[in-house]
Design a protein with these regions (language model features):
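Conserved donor-binding/catalytic core segment of Leloir-type glycosyltransferases
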Residues: 4, 148, 174, 182-210, ...
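Carbohydrate-associated surface elements
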Residues: 153, 173
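Membrane-proximal helix-turn-helix segments that form the acceptor-binding/catalytic region
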Residues: 103, 129-146
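Glycosyltransferase donor-sugar binding loop
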Residues: 38-44, 193, 220-234, 251-252
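Conserved acidic donor-binding segment of nucleotide-sugar-dependent glycosyltransferases
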Residues: 309-316, 324-330
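Aromatic "clamp/platform" in nucleotide-sugar-dependent glycosyltransferases that forms part
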Residues: 273
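Short hydrophobic beta-strand element within catalytic cores of glycosyltransferases
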Residues: 290-294
Length: 375
């Protein structure tokens, strides 16, 4: 079975690039000929992985909306595929892939990547998105063989927008492996990992450290990531305003630098209002590190499996979660870490997720029964 994905494996794209890469890798390990087409790389671009077949379009995006007139032709020039799979929405390459699949007479899937959450639609280019939804996207979604989402909340948002196509709920995968770096100091360190973006509410952690005062004086907040320069400047100004000497900006890290930085953290926090999954949670739980997330994120398992804190999206609750993380004993955090690692091994491994995705493709190709995760 030949599958062509359209998306990106560029590391700066964050979680979507990582989960797309791991999905491709897992599918190929299970005998599926999965490939990807994406825009050409810039000199500074780093890939999440380069051991899966990649094709590059002949042109780069011409506008902020990603308009690339030759993208559809580039897809069709690659030959025949059984199924086409687009990663993300509001993107020209997704429209092009859906159109190419229909021209080839083949089924296609679309993975929205959390971009159909009402908060995401409202926070940027809302007018364009609503116009695009009515003009083109909803039709593409409803003509898809299936829409793939990562949690039930995302499925609900799709239905509320008028998506009537079958929807498959399959979470993102995480690579199960041993990580050589271990925590080397006794500092109770709260980490943030991800894009530096206003949507991520990183200031919620800075506000928590300010509110805790002496309770956090011996702790540290480590912010790992890059992105919106203006927002980062605002965060640095906030730190300076509060006189916090225990907040550190590490910038974008990858490879061993990232592994070492994460290993130094006692707890990771994802204080954003919403995520369709939040690959950061996968990345830290597999390393045996507990996590804080808000209830706008589909991570009730942090609470039910005792591997972190799942709290309402309010500053008071985020501050209280940070307080509890700072006050927890080493033994408590270690137990939470073991629970998180076990959860990842049981439900989120690359092999497990690739098996589900393969069964979804086989159903679409009329070669297998409808999986139970398709609604």
């Amino acid at each position: 079975m030949r599958i062509l994905h359209s998306g990106t494996l560029v590391a700066s794209a964050g979680g979507p690039a990582m989960s797309t890469y791991l999905t491709l890798k897992g599918l190929r390990e299970q005998g599926v000929d999965a490939e990807i087409i994406m825009f050409p790389l810039n000199n500074e671009d780093k890939l999440r992985g380069d051991d899966v077949p990649m094709h590059f379009a002949t042109s780069t995006p011409k506008t902020p909306l990603g308009f690339a007139p030759t993208y559809k032709r580039d897809i069709l020039s690659l030959g025949d595929y059984d199924i086409y799979h687009a990663q993300g929405v509001w993107l020209w390459n997704t429209y092009a892939l859906a159109s190419a699949a229909r021209k080839a007479g083949k089924p296609y899937l679309i993975t929205p990547r959390g971009m159909l959450y009402p908060q995401d639609i409202a926070k940027s280019n809302a007018f364009f998105k609503k116009l695009s939804l009515r003009w083109r996207l909803l039709d593409d979604l409803n003509r898809a063989a299936c829409v793939h989402v990562t949690c039930k909340e995302e499925m609900m948002h799709c239905r509320n927008l008028g998506v009537t196509a079958p929807i498959a709920v399959i979470p993102n995968p995480v690579e199960i492996k041993d990580y050589p770096y271990k925590k080397q100091d006794g500092v109770r360190r709260i980490g943030y990992l991800g894009r530096v973006s206003r949507r991520k509410n990183i200031e919620g952690l800075i506000e928590a450290f300010h509110a805790l005062g002496d309770e956090a004086k011996d702790a540290e907040l480590l912010i790992i990531g890059s992105g919106d320069k203006e927002y980062e400047s605002y965060l640095r100004h906030l730190v300076e305003k509060y006189g916090l000497s225990n907040v550190r900006f590490a910038g974008f890290l990858s490879g061993e630098e990232k592994d070492e930085a994460l290993a130094s953290c006692s707890v990771l926090a994802m204080p954003s209002e919403f995520e369709n999954l939040g690959n950061v949670v996968l990345e830290v739980l597999v390393r045996g590190i507990p996590c804080i997330a808000t209830t706008g994120n589909p991570w009730e398992e942090l609470q039910s499996r005792n591997c972190g804190w799942w709290v309402p999206y309010t500053q008071l609750d985020i501050t209280n979660a940070v307080r509890q993380a700072l006050q927890a004993s080493d033994a408590t955090l270690a137990e939470m870490g073991r629970n998180g690692r076990q959860l990842m091994e049981q439900r989120y491994s690359v092999t497990s997720i690739a098996h589900q995705m393969k069964s979804l493709y086989e159903w679409i190709a009329a070669a297998a029964p409808k999986p139970e995760f398709v609604r």
